[in-house]
Amino acid sequence: MIPGMGMNPKQLKQMQRAMKQMGMDMKDLRGVEEVVIKLKKKEIIIKNPRVNVMDFMGQKTYQVTGKARECDLEAEVKIPDDDIELVMNQTGVSREEATRALQETGGDLAEAIMRLS
């Protein structure tokens, strides 16, 4: 249920009954190996999380607890020199502009060329 509440089992049962009467239902989601939250420029990865699902009047809310690790997506993109040269030749831009466009598009050659043309 809700970790760290410091309730004895009787209080917990009473709270669960009260939640049920208000139309709230809370369950553990079992077997979750990983939760990934994708943002524009990074990902938050939670391995072996504890996930609770609360259903209140048809609206589901997920509570995720665990140790999170952040990955910067921009830092992970490795752009080959051949790709940079191709974008430079196709668009006539500088090496820095071609590299920036490729990083912004995640290494997508066609998208980088279209953005610079």
From Swiss-Prot:
* PROSITE patterns with a match to the protein in the record: NAC_AB (PS51151)
Alphabetical list of InterPro entries matching this protein? EGD2/NACA0like, NAC-like_UBA, NAC_A/B_dom_sf, NAC_arc, Nas_poly-pep-assoc_cplx_dom, UBA-like_sf
Q: Any idea where the NAC-A/B domain is?
A: 9-77
Q: List the disulfide bonds.
A: none
A single GO molecular function term of this UniProt record: RNA binding
Pfam families, per database record:
NAC, UBA_HYPK
- Keyword field: Protein transport, RNA-binding, Transport
Q: Give GO BP annotations, semicolon-separated.
A: protein transport
GO CC terms: nascent polypeptide-associated complex
Q: Which SMART domains match?
A: NAC
Q: Which family does it belong to?
A: Belongs to the NAC-alpha family.
According to the record's subunit comment, the protein's assembly and interactions are:
Homodimer. Interacts with the ribosome. Binds ribosomal RNA.
Q: What does this protein do?
A: Contacts the emerging nascent chain on the ribosome.
Task: Name it.
Answer: Nascent polypeptide-associated complex protein
The protein's organism comes out as Methanothermobacter marburgensis (strain ATCC BAA-927 / DSM 2133 / JCM 14651 / NBRC 100331 / OCM 82 / Marburg)
Its organism's taxonomic lineage begins at: Archaea, Methanobacteriati, Methanobacteriota, Methanomada group, Methanobacteria
